[in-house]
Amino acid sequence: MSWDDEDFDIPSNSKQAAASWEEEGNDEPLLDSWDIDEEEVARKKKEEEAKKKAEKEALKKKQEESKAKKLSKNKGQRALLDIDLVDENTRQELLKKAELDADLNNAADLFGGLGVAGEGGMDINEHPRERAAKAAAAAAAASGPTPARLTKDTPIDTHPLFQPTDRQEYEKLRKALAPVLTNLAEDSLMNYSSGLAIDLIRDLAQPLSIESIRKVVSTLNVISKEKEKAERQARLKKAGGTATGGAGKKKAKPAVKTNVNTSFKQDVFDDIDQSKYDEFEEDDFM
């Protein structure tokens, strides 16, 4: 048997080897030097945003400090103007107070930014006046809401007393207003009656119904009768009358004598001589 007569192919591994190298290379692609990591980009972006935010906050804080200094300076100028208008003793006291405030401001500016806390967690960076204002606000909050104060320029309807919601609050409003308004009559009764009371009653009665207005009229009639009675009693008392409205004391009538002696008349008739009149008869008078 000859080796030359047989045909057979020798398997070649070159293609398989090449394919295996290509597959192995595709499994884990290598990053080139110019490729950028996404996590790194996100981290740098966050750092830039944080930096910008910090710069904005620092700028805002600086503007607020500048504004506060300007306001403080203006207050100091107003204080100096006020100092010039007072007497010497008060002027010296105000000057000392202004110097103390200036020293406190300088100390606050000097220690600003140190971030040092004092005893009890107190921040020494905080201005003493600001600390005092906070303490006053805390004390006011602890003691409850302060009552509203009215001035000539304050709208009266903003006061809580003028915002009633039920019958009790309306009665409270009436009891508060009545003595204040009626006391004005002591200062000027003419202005009170012509400029306030009469017109106020009319204005208050405008929204009422007819039945309610009749009740108002009836109430005023009762007051009017009581006033008339009081004035009449005062006049009678002044003229010497009684307190109950009677006339003055009347003069006593002379007493009637009931025990008159009638025997005197009978004795007179008995002493007359009637015989003298016997000669006259009835015919004589015809």
UniProtKB/Swiss-Prot annotation:
It comes from the Eukaryota. Keywords: Coiled coil, Cytoplasm, Initiation factor, Protein biosynthesis. Transmembrane segments: none annotated. Residues 1-35, 141-162, 229-258 are annotated as: Disordered. GO terms for molecular function: translation initiation factor activity. Residues 35-75 form a coiled coil. It holds the Pfam family eIF3_subunit. GO terms for cellular component: eukaryotic 43S preinitiation complex; eukaryotic 48S preinitiation complex; eukaryotic translation initiation factor 3 complex. Residues 21-35 have a biased composition (Acidic residues). One of its GO terms (biological process) is formation of cytoplasmic translation initiation complex. It is found in: Cytoplasm. Belongs to the eIF-3 subunit J family. Component of the eukaryotic translation initiation factor 3 (eIF-3) complex, which is involved in protein synthesis of a specialized repertoire of mRNAs and, together with other initiation factors, stimulates binding of mRNA and methionyl-tRNAi to the 40S ribosome. The eIF-3 complex specifically targets and initiates translation of a subset of mRNAs involved in cell proliferation. Component of the eukaryotic translation initiation factor 3 (eIF-3) complex. This is Eukaryotic translation initiation factor 3 subunit J.
